[in-house]
């Protein structure tokens, strides 16, 4: 028979499980918040996000609630991307995936073993609603590369904005195959929607993101990979018992780069990277800009290039530099400012040289040693000088 302490422990355990079930069934562990607040209290999930506004990074952070983002592919990168956007308080999130959660996915982030067998979009939506019930999450469990599903995908991003009937603000591609990337590329070119393409290499030690503005920058078909250019069926490249490697670290970094640039684009701060790569072996982050291909195979890309060329160009106004005037007319203490690279003025000359890094200077420089021969004048005396001549020299001294 169980003791009183054991019964109490069982009751506490059951009560804890009941609270979790209630929170899950309600869609979240807290009540919805109508308006974001910058009040610094432990119960405010937006205080640290609103601090970006107070620090002058973002002019109006709450605008993120008026943004709608579509995430295509809820795998290693896509699930973390959706998680980050949900925690940032995005207004609307539309998820696309047709796969199921497997135990083989547990080496990556976000999903848990008890979700194995569930569709990725439903499992993700359940967790994301628990994290932030303020975000409106829509799920689409189908393969966008089929003819029937492509039309549904096209309509979903065309009418999935915050206001009914308006397009989404941004499409994020987090898929793991070229066929799906080409489908997203075609849809966004047709609708003239800006989107981000992302990916991680098969050896899991490199990745990238690419911001595609139809007509302005290169689309995915402008410089396609060999598999796409040669119309090779990706399924024929797969081998039984062989799979691509994956690291949660690389996928987390790529997802972070993707969401960071998404926030910069949606909230208009910083500079959005056209292309940002990542090499984990040497911690290298290459950046570049890609121009559209005038002979691109995608006819919608050609149309968007024509539209972009027909737009009136923005006139650049050259800023006239203002003349710098001294803040104070008088310099009572004789203070002088020198440039950081002015090593001649910042370090005393003592006759000795020290190799130090740029921007550093020595706190103490030892005085140069002086030789007695330099301060006193001596007269050379040769051995063949006579005694009379030597006496004459001594008298003249």
Swiss-Prot record:
Protein name per its UniProtKB record: Ubiquitin-like modifier-activating enzyme 5
GO molecular function per UniProt: ATP binding; metal ion binding; UFM1 activating enzyme activity
Keyword Lipid biosynthesis: no
Region annotation Disordered: where it falls in the sequence: 362-384
Entry superkingdom: Eukaryota
Positions contributing to Zn(2+) binding: 219, 222, 296, 301
Family membership: Belongs to the ubiquitin-activating E1 family. UBA5 subfamily.
Taxonomic source organism: Aedes aegypti (Yellowfever mosquito)
Record flagged with keyword Zinc: yes
GO cellular-component term (any): cytosol
Task of the protein: E1-like enzyme which activates UFM1.
Biased composition (Low complexity): 375-384
InterPro entries for the chain: D-isomer_DH_CS1, ThiF/MoeB/HesA, ThiF_NAD_FAD-bd, Ubiquitin-activating_enz
Keyword annotations: ATP-binding, Metal-binding, Nucleotide-binding, Ubl conjugation pathway, Zinc
Gene Ontology BP, a term: protein ufmylation
SUPFAM superfamilies with a match to the protein in the record: Activating enzymes of the ubiquitin-like proteins (SSF69572)
Active site positions: 243
Residues that, per the record, bind ATP: 76, 97, 120, 143, 177
Record-linked Pfam families: ThiF
């Amino acid at each position: 028979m169980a003791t009183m302490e054991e019964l109490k422990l069982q009751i506490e355990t059951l009560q804890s499980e009941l609270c979790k079930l209630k929170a899950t069934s309600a869609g979240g562990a807290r009540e919805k918040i109508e308006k974001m607040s910058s009040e610094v209290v432990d119960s405010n999930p937006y205080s640290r996000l609103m601090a970006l506004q107070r620090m002058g990074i973002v002019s109006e952070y709450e605008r993120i609630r008026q943004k709608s983002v579509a995430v295509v592919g809820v795998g290693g990168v896509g699930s973390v991307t959706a998680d980050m956007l949900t925690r940032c308080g995005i207004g609307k999130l539309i998820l696309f995936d047709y796969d199921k959660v497997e135990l083989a996915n547990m080496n990556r982030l976000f999903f848990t073993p008890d979700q194995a067998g569930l569709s990725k979009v439903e499992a993700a939506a359940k967790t994301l609603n628990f994290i932030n019930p303020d975000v409106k999450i829509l799920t689409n469990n189908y393969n966008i590369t089929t003819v029937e599903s492509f039309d549904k995908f096209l309509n979903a991003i065309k009418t999935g904005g915050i206001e009914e009937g308006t397009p989404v603000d941004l499409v994020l591609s987090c898929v793991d195959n070229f066929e799906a990337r080409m489908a997203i590329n075609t849809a966004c070119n047709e609708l003239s929607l800006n989107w981000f393409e992302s990916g991680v290499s098969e050896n899991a030690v490199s990745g990238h993101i690419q911001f595609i503005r139809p007509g302005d920058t290169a689309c995915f078909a402008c410089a396609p990979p060999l598999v796409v250019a040669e119309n090779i069926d990706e399924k024929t490249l797969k081998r039984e018992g062989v799979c691509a490697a994956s690291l949660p670290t690389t996928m987390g970094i790529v997802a972070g780069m993707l969401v960071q640039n998404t926030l910069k684009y949606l909230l208009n701060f910083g500079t959005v990277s056209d292309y940002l790569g990542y090499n984990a072996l040497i911690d290298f982050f290459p950046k570049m800009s890609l121009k559209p291909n005038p002979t691109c195979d995608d006819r919608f890309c050609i149309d968007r290039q024509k539209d972009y060329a027909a737009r009136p160009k923005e006139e650049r106004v050259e800023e006239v530099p203002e003349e710098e005037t001294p803040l104070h007319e008088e310099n009572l203490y004789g203070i002088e400012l020198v440039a950081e690279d002015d090593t001649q003025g910042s370090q005393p000359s003592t006759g000795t040289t020290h190799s130090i890094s740029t921007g550093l200077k020595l706190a103490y420089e030892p005085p140069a040693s002086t030789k007695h021969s330099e301060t006193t004048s001596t007269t050379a005396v040769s051995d063949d000088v006579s005694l009379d001549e030597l006496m004459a020299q001594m008298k003249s001294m």
